[in-house]
Amino acid sequence: MKQAPQNATGTPAAAPLAHPYVGMWVTQDGHIRHELLPNGRYDEARGHRKSAYQGYYTITGHHIDYVDDTGFTAEGDFRRGVLYHAGMVLYREEPAP
């Protein structure tokens, strides 16, 4: 089972603050929403269920690995501005101005 990366103090390592993939990723119908937070955590909403899954993520190049708080792992890839994850296609949601 994968574990979240840790720093020297044994706490989860943070993702870079300025990483270009940080932000909200949403399926075309809006049902699945992945918020990649700058601290290396993610929050996934499904339909009306906010925070359905939460955990850590790491990004290496264009690949993302997820480890939720129960230990479940998943992965995905960013290609041409689109996140492909577990059979889903998610698009970046730009923040409102």
Question: Predicted regions span which residues?
Answer:
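Lipid interaction determinants
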Residues: 1-97
